């Protein structure tokens, strides 16, 4: 998987802000959270790279959903 980490982080932040502004009441939110758990199992290296770049763990459901919504902008 080749994704520009800087561009991904910008998209992640946009998705996170959207979720925050809408109090997580967004179609596909629960599915995205569940999908993150599965994605993590197969793509630990990418998630770790993102966490290191960002300097913060993905520790909330909102962050997990934002990650998956951001990822949906790239073909993987």
Region spans (language model):
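Acidic, low-complexity, intrinsically disordered interaction modules
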Residues: 20-76
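N-terminal acidic leader/helix
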Residues: 3-25
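Short intrinsically disordered terminal tails
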Residues: 1-6, 72-76
């Amino acid at each position: 998987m080749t994704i520009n980490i800087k561009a991904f982080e910008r998209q992640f932040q946009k998705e996170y802000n959207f979720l925050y502004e809408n109090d997580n009441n967004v179609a596909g939110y629960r599915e995205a959270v569940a999908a993150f758990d599965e994605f993590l199992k197969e793509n630990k290296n990418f998630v770790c790279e993102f966490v290191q770049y960002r300097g913060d763990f993905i520790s909330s459901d909102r962050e997990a959903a934002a990650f998956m919504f951001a990822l949906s902008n790239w073909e993987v």
